[in-house]
């Protein structure tokens, strides 16, 4: 993965989250995977810390394409948890997305 590739993907995902096309958890997972390429130390970067923390806290929950692998009853139980966590994290993740767009759009 190159810096430029990661930058372009991060910008696309950040926009998709803000436009509501990608869920908060799914988007945070994607964005957190680019942090190591975009910043010197993602664990010290306030935007990527938010994204990485949410990724870590929710790595047991099915989002995106992974949902197709889950049994319907188990999925329904997890959906309530996903909805609650996404509602709680929405403002902070969207702020990180706006910061990422501002920081990397002109880079």
Per-segment meaning from a language model:
Residues 1-107:
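Acidic, Ser/Pro/Thr-rich low-complexity regulatory regions
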